[in-house]
Amino acid sequence: MTSDLHQRRRPPTEEELASIPWLVLLLPKERERAINALRVGDAEKGDFVCRVGRPVTYWFGTVSGLLKMSTDNEDGQTMTFTGVPPGGWFGEGTALKREDYRYNIQALRASVVAGLPLETFHWLIDNSLGFNRFVMNQLNERLAQFIAAREFDRLNNPDLRVARNLAALFNPVLFSGVGDLLRITQQELAYLVGLSRQRVNEALIHLQEEELIRVEYGGLRILDLQGLRTRMIDRRNRDNQSKDIAL
């Protein structure tokens, strides 16, 4: 945690503990140790949870709100990797290797962030089969997500970028707290996708017309996650075929 957030840390409430997906996978003694070590912080909009170059001290998860994972390139431009909605835990690779962070995590709105101290994280890795399975599933799912992100972003198709980001944010493995309703504004989605709010709105209209999502007050409801993923693949294949014909 950054210094300001670290100073605001506190023990989690029962409701907050109930939202942490991996706790139910632990044996009673493991769960007791984890709960005693867990701390939460109330992050304000713009607060950094972790920053590039800082040593890892916690494994973090989003209890409520919305975070973004990003880095700055040599030109000072920000490149956003993904959003982290409720139920999402991140940085397990960095925690496993005890590395410095290679990315920033920043709150896009007021959020509650949970942190498991690094030493407790490694104790669970060494002693808990359930915890190991959760972390391995996280790593595998995140790898697949980033491979897909690189593939779709190369097509430079705004509608596909919005669809890909939505499919990622509704991922039930990585973000179990989202369900079928994601609390997000169009401006927040624009920050994550790297497009203008107007262009994001156009893409959402297209997706809603295809009955894949529904735009609701304060959020987006997924109607057909598999259909959204299929649309991405079909559109990608059509774009690739068009490029082949042009060549």
Short names for language-model regions:
Residues 64, 119-120, 141, 187, ...:
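Alpha-helix/helix-capping structural signal
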Residues 31, 80-140, 144:
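Cyclic-nucleotide recognition modules
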Residues 22, 47-109:
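Cyclic nucleotide-binding regulatory domains
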Residues 108-109, 126-194:
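Polybasic "coupling" helices that flank or enter modular domains
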Residues 32-33, 49-53, 173:
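Short loop/turn motifs at secondary-structure junctions and domain boundaries
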Residues 169-247:
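Phosphate-/nucleic-acid-contacting segments
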Residues 1-45, 94-96:
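Cyclic nucleotide-binding regulatory module and flanking cytosolic helices
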